Every structure is written in C-alpha cells, then in structure tokens.
Amino acid sequence: MSALRVPGLPRTVLRLHRPALIVWGAFVAALIGWLVWLNTVTSSAGERERAYCDHHETCNILDQLNYGQRTVWVATLVCYSSLAVAAWAGASLIGRELESGTAQLAWTQGVSPARWLAAKLAVPALLTTLGCTALVLAYRRAWSAHPGLRDGDWTSVTTFVARGPATVAYALCALALGALTALLLRRTLPALGVSLAATWALHFALERFREHLWPSVTRVTATEDVWPRHVWQLESGTIEHGHRVAHAGGSPCEGNPAQVKQCADKLDITGYYQVYHPRSHYWPLHLVESGIVLAVAALATVLAFRLLPRRTRAARKESLA
Amino acid sequence: MTDTTGFALEAAAVGKRFGRRRGSGGWALRDCGFRLPAGRVCAVVGPNGAGKSTLLALAAGLLVPTEGRVTVLGTDPASARARVGFVAQDKPLYPHLTVAETLRMGADLNPRRWDAPTAERIVADGDLGPKTRIRALSGGQRTRVALALALAKRPELLLLDEPMADLDPLARHELMGVLMAQAAQYGTTIVMSSHVVAELEGSCDHLLLIGGGRVRLAGEIDELLEAHVRVSGLAQTSLAPHTVVESRTTGRQLSALIRPAGPLPEGLRTSAPSLEELVLSYLRNPQAPGTTPAEAASESEKATL
C-alpha cells in the first residue's frame, strides 16, 4: 500500500476495512475461478454430450444441465452481490462507527465529517466498481462461450443484470443506501437489516417493472404465428371486433387449418398479435434500469451528506439576541 | 499559540437539549456562559449527569448547541477541528487495529501536525507492544493510546473527558506529568473533566463548576479560593451581608463557607478553604448563589490583563 503512496485518509479507510477488502477480493476471484472451471472442464463434457445427442435417439444430458444450472448460480451471485455490499455498508462501514463512537474519533482528528464520509464512500465505491466490472466481463465471456448449453435466455432475471453495468450500479446504490440508513439509524444491526431490505426492494421493484422500461414491439399477423426467436415474450392474443383480447393459455382456436379458420370466423377474429422485446432491446432496457439505479444512488448519497451535519456540526450560524 | 481574542474556549448562553420533548426535561446544559483564557489548565467538575460531557462534546464540535454559541480558539468548533484534541469518556478506538496502526492512523489523519516521537514515547512508557491489538488492551492501556493520539496532534486546545478514570495511581501521576509538560512546553490549553476533585488539585489553575446543567462557579482557582472564607463562631452571629454558600449549626456553634462582601464581623474564626471543600460546599447546596457568567467573564478578563 505504501508503495502506491495513497493519501492519508483513503489509506486509513483501507486499513480500517482490510478484512472486507480481502473478503471482496476473494469473492470476485472465486467467482471468476468458478466460471473458468465451468467453461473449461464442465463445458467440454457438456459439448461432448450434445454432440452425442445430435446423432443418437437416447442420450444423457446431465453435464449440459449441470453447466447451465451452475452458470445461472454464478449469475445469481453476481446480480445479488449488491445485497452483501448493502449489508456491509450499513453495518460495518458506517453503522458500527456511529454506534461505538469511533466515528467521533475520526471527526476529532484533523478530518471534517464531510471528508470522512466522502472517503468512506469513494474508496469502497472504487473497489466495488473494479470488482463488479471484473465479474461482469467474466460473466459476459462465459455466457457467450457455449450458447448451446445455456439455461435460460437473456431475459432471465439474474442474467439480465449480470451481463452489464447494472451490476455495478446496483452495488454502488447499495453502498449509498447502506451509508444513508446507517446515518439515519446510527445502530449496526438495524442499519444492516434496513439497508439489506431497501436494496432487495429496489431489485424486486425493478424486476417487476423491467419490461416497461423501454417501449415493447407489437407484431400483428393474419394467421397465428410462432414467436420470433430469442425475444422476451410479454403478451399474445387475438384481435376480435378490432379489439385486442389477450390469451394467456394459448389460442382459442385449435385443430387443422380449416377448423381454425371456421372457429376464427365464428369468433370474428381478424388477426393475431404478439407483444415482446426483441433481443436488440437488451441494451436500452439495461441502460435505463442502470440509470434509475444510479439516480437512486445519487439521491441516497446527497441525502447522506445532508444528514451528516445533523449528526455532527458545530456553531450553527445563529445570531445571538 | 494564542488567538486574537486570547480565549481558548468561550460559551455564550449555550444550551443543549436532547430529544424533542418540550418542557423542563431534556436540557443537558442551559444558559451556560464562561470564558477560558488560553494557556490555562481548566478543571471541569460537577456531579454525574451535570453536563460535563455535553459541554466538552460541544467544544469538540461533535454536538450542535440548541441555543447560544460556542467559540473555540477564536472560531467555531468545526473550523478549529485540526487544532483541538479530544478524548471522549469511553475512549473509542478501533478494536481491530494494532497500537502501531492506530498511531499511523493518527499520522495519516493529522498531516503536518503529527508529532510521532511524542506518540511513540507515551505508548512505550506504558509497555505497550506496537503489535498488540487495541481489543486486547485494558481500560487504562486504551486511555494511554487515546491520550497519545490526542497529544501527538499537538493541539492548541486539549479536551479530556474523565481522562484518568481507569488509570492506576502510578499511570495517573505519570500521564498527568506528560500533560502538564505539554501544557508548559507548547502553551496548550487543557480542559479536563472529573468528578474527583483531588485528582485535579495541584495541576489545574482554572475551575469550571457545573451543576444541574448550569455553570455554578468559574474562574482562576486561586482567586476563587481567596474570594471564599471558612468561618466558625457563635450560632447567633449574623452573616449578612456576606454571601453564604453553606452554613451548619451544631449546638451553639456555627460553621459556614461564605463569600465575604466586606469586613467580617468580630469574633469569627476564619480559615482558608481547600478546593475540595469549596467544590463540595457548592455541590451540597444547589441553591447557593454562584458567580454569574458575567462576573466570571470579568474575572477572566482581569486575569488575562
């Protein structure tokens, strides 16, 4: 550390949170290591199986399933790594300092509370960004390495986040939310719980509304058609009397083409429609979501800095009567 | 070392209320006013819960006064941060750091001011290994590390909240010596609170007596002692017009501590009170009139001339 000549305050933050830094580094390294293992050892077994299956009536798909499933696990860990950041930021980074009074130790050294909070946020933000970026790059590489063995498409909840900067945005937001809740509550355990809950709620809310973050595509066809490949299917149905009628459980008319035609005429079905996000919508959707999360992070950071003077500040500018 | 006003610490009508409850409850400090000239060693005494810690935290810029204004080294407490040392009552330190890492933290957080040899000497005098973790230290050893942190930043004003409470007599004597040497060498103003008056007698030259959230007595200890007389005589002796701090009648005998307003009546035996007697008399009699903040301020001004 000394070789890098880090200035005093960031160096102190690093020294204080060295255990967390080690755990975070180990987590990132372990996940990348696991991805490398999956894409060298497990994937080759899966590809061998797939090649066998292409030429045989019956075959074993256990290795393919294993590869797909484990890749999804990695995506889940990458996507929700922000929850760990939230818990740490709320409890260890700020909450414990306020509870035990060590924050006051720092504030009575030559460091103002605002600089203290800035360093407490900036150093972890930098290291979180580095770690998450490494995870995202590794995951993207792994995800596109063996498309035939994949379990789930780009639309799956965790893969959607793990393939892009939203992972970094969620982690930074968790950091800011953790700091804000810790400054609000000033207790380690409540801050841990609330920070975790707030970050989870943000994930949950955006997962629910993700499909609305970018305008979807509607395709109208005269006859019922299969879905385009690799799209995020949102809704499909028939057009009856000029109105859309959604059919969640499949078409109302079944059978051979003549039967379908007869049924459609009877129901006055004039066409079929499909609402979906094509694969090209991944980046617009992803970037809008990242932007929302970063906006929440910025808001939480501003609130934290505005709350800080109420925790400690001297000499309110008041005139004395 | 002294600033333009010559006062290290000034409080003007300072009040601090905890919680939002209205009414009498919640005030830790009320209408508190005093001036402490630079270069003094000031004892802040008072019973438990009198507001001593609140006053020191206000001076350290860790609390905002609800009303009034605190001035530290001629400026507001936040701006004076780098020039003020503070050791809180519970001596907060990072438990997972070693002694050496704690001192390195002090050096990092106080660039340009840090006096590493002083810090190392204070720690070494307590036989603390630099590799020992803070959580493995006893209460007294932690106090030593906290004092090393506060002293090595070469503060102009050093605020110590019950600094000697968990030190053994030997360490107490030695660290008091270190503090006094610092005060003498660099002209550091030291403000230390305690509820053990004996601990402060002989090393402090200024007194701030706080009771019930108010300043009861403030001034140079010598002047305060001179201004008070312990008298004894016959019970029917009238003590008017002198200010009676405490009086006790046993049988036909009267003994009292008074602040004389003029020549004393004939037939009274007088003696000089000790600091402890003076403090205890005021603490036992909360209704006894103290010196008003204005008087204290004028006394302080006289003292600086």
Feature names for model-found ranges:
Chain B
Residues 45-47:
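The feature captures the beta-strand-to-loop junction immediately N-terminal to the Walker
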